[in-house]
C-alpha cells in the first residue's frame, strides 16, 4: 500500500468542507492533496475558467488539480507529462500528492520549497512531510529534491526531473545519534518544542482542572488568602516577563485586582514598596534565574506572600517560594523558550479565572465557559502548527530584513513583545515591539520603504485602531503582515500577507497568536543558516546578574 500521512491548515479560504483536501477535477479524473502556497493561483484560475472549468472551493490546491487535469487531457500523455506541463506554470511552493483515475495503483508526487520525504518498507511506500511522520513505518527513505517528482507504487518509487527524465536516487537509512534521537527526528530542539506545545499546555491544564473546576490545592493558595490579596506584583525576566504583561490584562479584567508587572533586574534594585497584603508572583522556567531569585528573597524579606510559577521541580525558586505552581512543559533544551512560555500563560489564566470566581467577579456560568475555552486551546494550537509551511514560505522572504516592527494594543502588545524577542534572539534581525498608539510619538520616523511591520489584531474592540496604525505605516512604505482571527478577512485590503488563527476568548488570544510568531522567528533563523537552538551570546538559564 502507498500511504500518505496528511493534515493541512487553511491558507486560501477558511476551514470548511468545500475547502478541505483532497481536491478533484470536474470529472473526478485527477485528485490531489497539497502543502504550500501557489502565488499565481488567481491568474491560473482565470485561465481555467476561460477553458470551461468550474470551481467549488476558494483553495489554490483545486487550481493545481484542474491545471494538471487540463494538460493531461490536452496532450493525452502520461501523468508525468501532465504534471510537468502544470508545474512549470505554477509559481510558489508546493508538496503535491496526485492520483489519476486511469492509474489507480499509483500516486504521483512533486515538491518545490515545501518539505516532503518518501519511505519504503516490505512492499509498501509512504509519503510524508518530514521524517517523524513516517518513522514508525520505516527507516528507509528517499529525499526528493527541489523541483523533482516521483511515481510511487507499492514498494517501488521512480524519480523524475521537471523535464520528465528519469533520475536515480539513493535509498538512505535514517540513523539517529543520541542527540537526534532526543529531537525525535526534528531538525532542531526548538521546532520539536514548538510541536510539543499542545501536549505541554494540556498537561498543565490537567494538573489543575479537576471535574471541570480549577483546583489550586497543590499550588498552596487557600480561598481565604486569595480573598485577601490587595494587589499582585508579577516579577520575571525575558519571555517570562512577557507572560506577565499578558497576565496583567487578564487578571485585572477578570479578577479586578490591581497588577504591576516588573522586570526582576529592575524590581530588586529599586527598594520596592510592597503592600503587606499583596502577592508577588515570580515566573521562571528554570527556577534559578538570578534576578528573579533575588526579587523573591526581597519580597519574602518584606513579609509579602510569594508564588513561584516554575518548570523545574525542586529548583531554588520552587523551594523558597511560599506557594509553587509547576508548569508541566517537560525539559526545554532550546535557548529560545516556546513550550515553557505557553505553559506559563496557562498558569496565569487559571490563576486569573480562579481568583475571579473566589472574589465573586464572574458567575458560575462564566467560570465554566472560561474553563471550557481553555480546554480547547491545545487543539487550536495544533491547528496553527499544522499551517507551518505557509510561515516557512513567508520567512524565506525576510532573510535580508534589517528592521522589523511588531505593533499591537492591550494583549496584542504583550504578544508583540514576545514575537519581537523570538525574532531578534534567534535570527539576529533588529526587531522592536511597540504599543501601536505610540507609533506617532516618534517611532514612525523609523519606517522606511520595505520595512516589515507586523500588526497583531486579536482583540475585537481594538481591531480598527491597530488597523489604522498599520495603514499609517503602509503610507510610509512599510510592508505589512497582519495576524488576526479567522473572519477578519478585510485585513487583506491593506496587509501584504495575512495569518489567521482560530477564534478564542480574547483574554486567551496570546496562547494562539504567539505560535505563528515563534514559527516565523524559527524559519527566518533556519533560512539564514544560524544555530537556532544555541543563539550566540545567550544561555538557557540566566544564573548571572
Model regions and ranges:
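Active-site phosphate/pyrophosphate-binding segments
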Residues: 197-201, 205-233, 323-452, 525-545
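Conserved short alpha-helical segments that host acidic/polar catalytic motifs at enzyme active sites
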Residues: 1-183, 187-188, 199-230, 269, ...
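Glycine-rich oxoanion-binding loops at beta->alpha junctions
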Residues: 7-18, 208-224, 247-283, 289, ...
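Short, glycine-/Ser/Thr-/acidic-enriched flexible segments
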Residues: 9-12, 28, 37-39, 101-104, ...
Amino acid at each position: 500500500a502507498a500511504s500518505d500521512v496528511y493534515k493541512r491548515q487553511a491558507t486560501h479560504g477558511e476551514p470548511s468542507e468545500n475547502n478541505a483536501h483532497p481536491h478533484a477535477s470536474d470529472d473526478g479524473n485527477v485528485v490531489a492533496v497539497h502543502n504550500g502556497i501557489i502565488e499565481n493561483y488567481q491568474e491560473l484560475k482565470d485561465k481555467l475558467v476561460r477553458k470551461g472549468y468550474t470551481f467549488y472551493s476558494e483553495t489554490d490546491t483545486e487550481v493545481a488539480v484542474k491545471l494538471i487535469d487540463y494538460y493531461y487531457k490536452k496532450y493525452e500523455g502520461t501523468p508525468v507529462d501532465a504534471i510537468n506541463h502544470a508545474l512549470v506554470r505554477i509559481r510558489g511552493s508546493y508538496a503535491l500528492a496526485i492520483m489519476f483515475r486511469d492509474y489507480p495503483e499509483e500516486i504521483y508526487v512533486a515538491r518545490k520549497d515545501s518539505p516532503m520525504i518518501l519511505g519504503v518498507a516490505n512492499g509498501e511506500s509512504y509519503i510524508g512531510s518530514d521524517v517523524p511522520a513516517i518513522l514508525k513505518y520505516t527507516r528507509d527513505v528517499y529525499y526528493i529534491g527541489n523541483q523533482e517528482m516521483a511515481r510511487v507504487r507499492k514498494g517501488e518509487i521512480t524519480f523524475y526531473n521537471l523535464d520528465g527524465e528519469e533520475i536515480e536516487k539513493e535509498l538512505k537509512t535514517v540513523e539517529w545519534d543520541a542527540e537526534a534521537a532526543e529531537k525525535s527526528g526534528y531538525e532542531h530542539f526548538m521546532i520539536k518544542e514548538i510541536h510539543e506545545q499542545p501536549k505541554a499546555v494540556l498537561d498543565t491544564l490537567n494538573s489543575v482542572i479537576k471535574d471541570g473546576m480549577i483546583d489550586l490545592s497543590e499550588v498552596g493558595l487557600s480561598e481565604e488568602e486569595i480573598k485577601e490579596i490587595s494587589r499582585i506584583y508579577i516579577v520575571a525576566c525575558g519571555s517570562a516577563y512577557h507572560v506577565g504583561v499578558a497576565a496583567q490584562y487578564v487578571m485585572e479584567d477578570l479578577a479586578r485586582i490591581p497588577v504591576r508587572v516588573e522586570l526582576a533586574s529592575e524590581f530588586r534594585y529599586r527598594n520596592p514598596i510592597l503592600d503587606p497584603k499583596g502577592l508577588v508572583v515570580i515566573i521562571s522556567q528554570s527556577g534559578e534565574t538570578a534576578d528573579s531569585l533575588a526579587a523573591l528573597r526581597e519580597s519574602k524579606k518584606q513579609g509579602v506572600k510569594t508564588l513561584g510559577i516554575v518548570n523545574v521541580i525542586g529548583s531554588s525558586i520552587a523551594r523558597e517560594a511560599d506557594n509553587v505552581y509547576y508548569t508541566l512543559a517537560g525539559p526545554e533544551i532550546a535557548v529560545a523558550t516556546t513550550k515553557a512560555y505557553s505553559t506559563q500563560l496557562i498558569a496565569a489564566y487559571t490563576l486569573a479565572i480562579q481568583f475571579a470566581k473566589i472574589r465573586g467577579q464572574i458567575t458560575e456560568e462564566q467560570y465554566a465557559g472560561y474553563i471550557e475555552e481553555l480546554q480547547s486551546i491545545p487543539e487550536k494550537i495544533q491547528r496553527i502548527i499544522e499551517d507551518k509551511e505557509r510561515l516557512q514560505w513567508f520567512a524565506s522572504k525576510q532573510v535580508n530584513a534589517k528592521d522589523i516592527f511588531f505593533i499591537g494594543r492591550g494583549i496584542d502588545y504583550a504578544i508583540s513583545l514576545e514575537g519581537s524577542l523570538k525574532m531578534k534572539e534567534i535570527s539576529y534581525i533588529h526587531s522592536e515591539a511597540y504599543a501601536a498608539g505610540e507609533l506617532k510619538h516618534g517611532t514612525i520616523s523609523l519606517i522606511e520603504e520595505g520595512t516589515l511591520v507586523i500588526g497583531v489584531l486579536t482583540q475585537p474592540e481594538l481591531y480598527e485602531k491597530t488597523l489604522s496604525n498599520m495603514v499609517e505605516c503602509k503610507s510610509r512604505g512599510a510592508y505589512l503582515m497582519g495576524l488576526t482571527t479567522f473572519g477578519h478577512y478585510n485585513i487583506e485590503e491593506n496587509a501584504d500577507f495575512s495569518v489567521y488563527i482560530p477564534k478564542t476568548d480574547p483574554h486567551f488570544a496570546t496562547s494562539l497568536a504567539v505560535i505563528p510568531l515563534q514559527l516565523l522567528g524559527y524559519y527566518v533563523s533556519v533560512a539564514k543558516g544560524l544555530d537556532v537552538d544555541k543563539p550566540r551570546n545567550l544561555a538557557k538559564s540566566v544564573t548571572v546578574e
